[in-house]
Amino acid sequence: MLRLEWVRRLQTITQAGLTYTRDAYDRQRYEQLQELAAEIAESFAPVTSTASQLGATGSQLGATSESWLDLIRAEKGYATPKVDVRGVVERDGKLLFMREAHDGLWSLPGGWADIGESPSQIAEREVLEETGFVVKASKLLAVYDKARHAHPPEFWYCYKMFVRCELHGGAPARSIETLDTSFFGVNELPPLSQPRVTEAQVRRMFEHLAHPDLPTDFD
């Protein structure tokens, strides 16, 4: 979506400009550009990732220029991609999925990377919090540029990491984010939460499980 790309580029430029400028007039101009970006966003209300972990529409936000402006101005410092980490947990040839409370659809457990945690720690924690299973991260299977895959468009530019995790214990559990948990085989996939994971990505994870010597995917 071209207009979403305009908004994203304006946000990146203004965020960097406000970080490094020491000129009061330049700061004012960058803030005006942020307001313009918010007005552009309001005009088409794209899919974004603000109201929940990775999926809310502009209309669900109210899609006003004020709400978009708050979103655009929330990030500080030099703009870099966000990171989403997913745990890939296998049992008897099936993968562990959790049913998202936000949209009622299914995803591999995971979420935004937190500062102070390594990718393996994030994957292990997210799996435990969202499904109740205790796991140990063992291999980075993939790092994907989300914009290059068949996800719905969203405001944040994001990299997705898929981490193989070995099952060590625990039991199925629900959480604020989780309606249900279950294991599914490659030929019995549930309806997927597309902002979080695509069918092609899930099928690729099954290929990694079948061929553990495959190198890490990237891009």
Which sequence ranges carry the predicted segments?
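N-terminal strand-loop-strand
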Residues: 50, 69-107, 135, 139
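Acidic, metal-coordinating catalytic segment for phosphate/diphosphate chemistry
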Residues: 31-53, 58-86
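Unchanged
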Residues: 113-137, 145-205, 210, 214-219
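Extended, positively charged loop/linker patches that create polyanion-binding surfaces
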Residues: 109-111
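Short, hydrophobic-biased amphipathic alpha-helical segments
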Residues: 6, 29, 197-201
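Short, solvent-exposed positions on alpha-helices
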Residues: 24-28, 154
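Long amphipathic alpha-helical segments
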Residues: 1-25, 38
